[in-house]
Every structure is written in C-alpha cells, then in structure tokens.
C-alpha cells in the first residue's frame, strides 16, 4: 500500500490512530536497500585508521551477518506491531492496560553498539514502540561502518524527508482538541516515574540532633594543639579497629583558631563519657580527666556552623596586631603569598629616630626596658631625620625611594613588612576617611589618587557596624531594590524595616539588610558626627554630598570636614565637642609659668588655646600645667578707671574696636567672647585699660560722665533735710556693685504671669529677668511689677531699705504697713490698730511704761525714769535714714541742746514719732514718747495710770529667779523700739500673770501660779515706792545660781 493512499489516511483518522502504519517501500527503495545490504557484506575499503586495518576480515563478515538477521527481525516485529494496532483499536481501555504490561515484557534483541548507547526504553503502547523503532533505525544507520569515501545515497534520505513531511501534514490538519485527546490517551495512564522523588531534598529539621544521637563532650586540651589531638584520636581509632580495644568514639573535631572563643577544646562524640576516658587515656596534649563539658542538644548545630574565611587581595585594608607599637594601626596589603599564610603590607611607621634612647651603660646594655614610654606619632619615614640621628643605620637608594633603617624596609615613606595572616585583623577594619587619605598616592598634577574599589571592599563589612535608629532616612544603594528611599521603622539584628517614601513602593514596608543601606542627607541638614573619626562629636551643616561622602561646615570652627554618611546623624543641638578630660571649651589654663590661655577648640587628642598675647597654641592635655578656676570676684579697671567684672560688656576703643562679654580676667588681660567674631570660637584677648565699658552686669551703666564711686554719698552734710522737709522720704541711695534684687524671691503683681513665684536672675535699670518656679522658663518683667518676698516666711520685704528690722513680721525696713510696734490700748499688742503706719513706736503703745524707765531724769517724779534724758544729744535713730546718728549731735548722753535731738523739733505732728521726744506741740503726742512723760503705765502697759495699782506688779518682765531681772541696771537696759519690742498681748502674751489685774484681760499670762521669780527681790526699776536708783533697783543685786 502506498504511503499516499487516501483511504489509509481516512481509516487512521476514523480510528483515531495518530501513528499510521508505515508505507510500503517502492521498488527503487527496495533495490537501494538490497544494494545497501550487499555493500555491507562486501569488504570495506581501507583507510588511514590503524584499528580498521588490523581488524580481521572474518569478524567483519560475522558482523554483517548479524546485521542482516537484525534487519529481518525488525521487519517481523513491524508486522506484528501492525496487527497489534488493529487489535488495540477494537479493545477497551481496560484491555489496553493489559496489552501495555505485555508490551513491557517483550524483549528485543539488542543491536550492535547498544552497550555504548542508552537507546532503549520501555513504552506503554505501540505508538511509542514505533517511535523507538524509527530512532533505532536512525542510530543503526549512524553506527553503520560506512566509510566517508562511499558515495552518499540520496534515495534513503529523500524517503526520510518525505516521511517527516507527511507526519507534519497530519499534525497540522488535525483538530487541536482531538490531538489533545490522543495525547491524553497515550500518556495519561503512564505510571512510570510515579513514586520517584528527589531524595536529596530533606527538611533541615530532620537533620538536627536528637536524644537518640550520641552526645558531644568538650574535652580540654593544650591551646594551639587542637588539630594534633584530633589527628591522634583518628589514628588511634584506625589502629584499634576490629580489636578487643576498639574505641566507641564516633567522631572528633575542633574549632580552634587565634580569634576563636572555642580554642583549647576538642569535641568528641560518643555514647558514654567512659568511652571518651578510655579512648583518650595516655594521649598527649589532652586532659580527659579534667572536667568535661556536655554540649546541649540545642547548641550542637552551632558547633558545625562554618564561617567563610575572608580572603586577602592586594589593596585590601587590614589592621596590625603585632608589634605592640603598631597595634591597631591601619595597613594596606601589597601582596599575598601563594600558600596564603603571609602577606606583605605597608603602613605608616612610628619612629623617634633614637631620641628616646638612653646612653648605654658600661656593660653595653640598655638601661630602659624595651616597650616603656609612649608610642611615637605616625609619620612618614624621613631620610634627613634618620641621617641626622643615626647615619650608620640607614642604607638605600634615593632614586627608587627604598631605604633600610635599623633592619626595617621603607618605601616612599611607608614601612613595608611581611606579616603572618594570624597577626592581622582582616574583618571589621572600618577604616576612617582620614586614615585612608594618608595612604593616597600623589599624581603628577598634585591631586591625590585613592583606590576607591579597595576602600569599598573593606567598608562592605564595616557597614554592619553602622547604627540605625527608627526615624533615620536611609537609601538602598545595592541589590534589586537599589535607589529605594525610606524611613527606618524597626531594627532587628542586621535587618532594618523601612517604610518607602519615594518611588513606586511608596507606603510599603520592606526589610533590607544593613549591608545594603546607607544614610541619606540633604544639603542644609544639621548633623552630628557619631562614628569612629577624629571629628567625632562635631556638629555642623551639610554643604556637599558625593556618593557616600558628606562634607559639613562645623558650627564651632567654621571649617569644612568630610566624613562617611554612616558616621553621621541628624542633630537638634548646636555646638560640638566641648571637653577633653578635665578641660572644657573656654576654660582658662596655665600653659607655662608665665603664660595662660583660653581653650578655644577641643579635638579628640589635643586642645587649641588662645594665650594672653593672642596667639593660638595647640597643646596636648599632658602639656597643660593646671586649670585656673574662674574667679567671680576678679576686678579690673577700664581706660576711664571704672570697675569691670566678669560678664560685663566692653568694647575696644582702638584697633578693630571689637565688642564682647568678659569671660576671664587675668591680671591686666581680659578674655572676651563675641558671637560676631568667627575666629578662635569667638574668643579674643586684650588689655583691660584698652576698653570702654558698654554695660555692666546687674544694670550698672558706666559712661565717661559717670565713672567711679559717688563721692557725694560720703558727705553727711549733704544728707541734711532743709526747709522743714525732714519728713520727706529720702530717695534710695545709688547702688554700687551687684543689684540687690538678683537672687531674690519675687511674686509678679501684673500681667499675664500675675501671681507666679520666681527668682530674679538678672536685672537692668528698669526690668528684671525672672525664672519662674512653675513653668521652668525665664521671662522679662518690669521691676515695678514685682513684689519681693522673704524666701523663708513669705512675707513682703523692701530690698531698698537700709534700716533695722520692722518687728517680727520679717520686714527688713523700718516697719511697714501692718508692722507697727507696739499697739495702743492692747497691753503691748503688735501691731497697733489704726495708728500711723510710719511711726515706730505707734501712738499709745508706750514701751516701757513710766515705772520701768532707765536711766532716770527727774528721778523724784513718780513717773519713773526716762530713757534717754531730756534733750539728749544721742537720740537714735533718724526716722528718715536708717540708723545714722543725727548730724551735729555731738554724741552727748544726755544732752540738753536741741540740736542733738532726733528728729529735730519744729514739727508738732512729727513729735509723736520721735524716740524719745518731749515738748511736742500736740499733747496727745506724749503717748508716743518712750518713755512717755507723766505716764505711769507699768510694763506691760495697763489701761489705767495709777502707779499704786497692781498693773506694775501683776505682770513683771519675765526672768529667772533673781538671775535675769528686766531690765537690769546698767547692763540690761530696756530694749529699743526697733531692736527688741515687747511682744504683743494677743500674739505673744507676757507669761507669768499674777492675781489678775488690769492687764490680765488684754495680756493674759499662762501659769498664774508661777509669778516671775524675784519679784520682791528685783522689781522693775522705777516702782512707785520711791525714786529708783540708777543703775539698780532697791532690791538686791544680781546673784548667780549655783
């Protein structure tokens, strides 16, 4: 049947057979095959291959016979498959499964060359068998011993192409759904491969150790011998394997190393601890009988966790560990040996060129032990210095820049050395930009060349040390999310959760590893240096950003510095590093015995001080002799002779005419600070006699017209009141020095802060700076809106008064409103009700009464003794001016002249306030005289004037039994009106009332049964029995109690 028979195609389509039977071969194709067989049986032509020439001809004929037999069998199999196809089309799907299983059991004879090619596979149906047959035919033709020189037969090739075209036409003409159904039937029931899975994928939780696994014990060994101990254990296991002493140890390993925290231990796995003791007995460098540590099951996986060993490459940055002089110094790798055990590095040397070497002793040994003393600073090697100090020890070539000094190699100023890898720190190097810049090589044009690639490689691990806080603005600079900008929300280990603020992912929260992040700043941000840099704690404004480097302008020195962004953080404060040890900014320090300086800059290791001559000097803290404490009482004189003190504002009158506030005064030099001066942190120095005072602290204003003290205040003649104006209040004297209002407790009387309590911190002529207690803030308030309070009692006080105390009310002046002493008709009540508030003592409050006056004038009078005598010249005090003795009194006691009276007569109304006073024009004023003229009121004052009444005896002045009568003669006068008034009856009654009396109701005395001792023995002078003696009463003198 022809392969192009349409009926055959229709039958195949109706029977849903996708693979039709092979078409019959034409005569020409059969002839071609026959000729092909004949050529296969004929001897193959010789070629250049030796293997083909040596092959026997008999074996070739045998192979040809086998090929003929195999082709005949293939034709028979093809016919059987054709019959099977017809049968399968008529059977049901269940029978197809049985036929498939039978087809699996059929065996075919292997073709020649099958041992070298995997060309056979089991199939589920005859369709696939037919495909395998075609594949076998192609492979058979492929391995046929055809010689390249044979003429290619195009007939067979054309047949195969026609067959391929026919199959493609069938596939293209078939409906897609029908084709899918055929494929489902063909491959749907295939079960080959089911149940086979990738056994290599095992959950990690199944690999974790459990209680059924052997235990791991940590056994101590000699440090550095961990690996040798493990090899010894494994060797012993191999030697005793299969013997009666076979070890029960299953494994042994170590995790030693220079930086390892587990060095000094070997870890042995066994079921029992006795197995380990038996296996390690008599082994060197291991101590099994010491305390062994059982490793917990949860800690076992950590013992097997392997960390990647960092590899060194030329150009990488490392830090030295040895020698101790260079411990921690940054170095750059030049080359690494092939075995990876040593590296050649270059670093900045620390040489003193023998300046600290002591002279050799007699035996030729050094006196100073090696390693003592501070480290020399890092400086590039100098051939000139070396030749100057020790010319014998230097050798080299100036043209190449290579030198040998004290058996050390130097190239281009750097020291070069071969160092073991164990003596280097290769992780977390974190080089600062300043350190790396010192390694930069100079180009011909003078610019610096920096190996940014090597620097980035070294900083890759150091980014893990960067600190991120919630709120930091960060940027992803590497990885798939490169360019994403967000704000840090949470930091967990080495992962930062950020909320995206820019880009397509706005509002989303993503997790980014710290190594892929860097902080982002904008020009104008106020930042602070926080990382490991010499500029640490500097504060400034961002002025330039380039990649990961940020340039800021410092607030303190107004200089530009460049640091990495990871070393910055946004700052809200203004200022910089203010202290280094015990020295702070603007401290006055002693530089040498004759020179002082003010600290104007503080670095990490040094200070910059502006000396008294205006020269800045950079010094180490160890070079400073001591710190001079600030003397708040220091005083200097300006060019006009006015006093200037700390915090006064002055201005130069020559030169630059700078103005500033005084921060230090040292002899004739003053150090000033000005916010307008940008040099030396705003500090400058000048001489005191070269400035004018602008404003003094506390409101003092010194000008050329008013300089020096007020000499008029020292002339008492100018203080007299003329033309009867003695009652007019004298204006407060001009204050000198510190304002009295400073540090006083005040209450605000007006304004928005009315009623609030505070402390005055600073004042001017009209205003005061008050620090409030409640709101913790300082405000400016006019002085007339303040009421000054006593901080202990809370009473209102007058800070401008210079007089005595105004009674027990706590006033500092001469009695104010409500502080009159004593009261009228109250028996010594304080204050007087309704009296003149300015007069002390007030009208009608005579203290003491007539019977207690001392000394006596006109002693024969029953009115008692007057104090002081009439018209005396020593009356004190002036009612208008503190406690000043009246001018012109002459100091007489007593005195008759009226000029010595205080106040001078002439004002009848004012007589009542004179102490004492006599002869006032107003008769009622006599009640205010002390003692009153012609009044016999006892002490305390009774309402009656009867000298024989009990008032003079009922409440005598308290005192001990004859030990302290009141008042004593000559040595215990009656207290003055200002210094010790008699307490009032209501607020402070006189104790010791006896048998009632006229004064008992107004001034009751507790403990009526306890009269004042010594009543009859020491009565108050001036009693009614007779003229009292002065000094002394009629009774006995004082006696001391034993």
UniProtKB/Swiss-Prot annotation:
Coiled coil: none annotated. Pfam families: CTD, KOW1_SPT5, KOW2_Spt5, KOW4_SPT5, KOW5_SPT5, KOWx_SPT5, Spt5-NGN, Spt5_N. Keywords: mRNA processing, Nucleus, Transcription. One of its GO terms (cellular component) is DSIF complex. Residues 807-820 have a biased composition (Gly residues). Residues 1-10, 157-177 have a biased composition (Basic and acidic residues). Residues 64-77, 84-100, 119-140 have a biased composition (Acidic residues). CDD domains: KOW_Spt5_1, KOW_Spt5_2, KOW_Spt5_3, KOW_Spt5_4, KOW_Spt5_5, NGN_Euk. InterPro entries: KOW, KOW_Spt5_1, KOW_Spt5_2, KOW_Spt5_3, KOW_Spt5_4, KOW_Spt5_5, NGN-domain, NGN_dom_sf. Component of the SPT4-SPT5 complex. Interacts with RNA polymerase II. The SPT4-SPT5 complex mediates both activation and inhibition of transcription elongation, and plays a role in pre-mRNA processing. This complex seems to be important for the stability of the RNA polymerase II elongation machinery on the chromatin template but not for the inherent ability of this machinery to translocate down the gene. This is Transcription elongation factor SPT5.
